[in-house]
Amino acid sequence: MNKRKKILIANRGVIAIRALRAAKELGYEVASVYSTADRNLKHLKLSDEAICIGPPDSRESYLNEAAIISAAELANVDGIYPGYGFLAENAEFAEKCKNSGFKFIGPSHEIISLMGDKIRAKDLMRQLGVPVVPGYDGPVDR
């Protein structure tokens, strides 16, 4: 018996539409979140399920980690795709997804943390043989 596959798209607009189309091509069901201001966006009509996560202010909706996790629980999804911006580069959110039993569809929280530290990231890239732009490699004093 095939396991049902379902993801939550935690973004809006063209980012959500592109992710939704790709997920559908891969055979996934899709739940999408939205703020009250975004209730008529196209990706919601294309989704299998749409869940309101808060008011228009993105700090209270698309950046509300608890609301996104609750929506994922409500929709009974396997993973959460943050898209771009909002929570996509938030290492703590990626870890919360994992700890809540959801696959964070993106880099691991460890990689997000590492790449957020530009000195450590540049050192790692050098170790891996990736060309880096020459320049100062230490912390900048203010």
Feature locations, PLM:
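N-terminal beta-alpha lobe that positions the nucleotide/phosphoryl donor
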Residues: 1-142
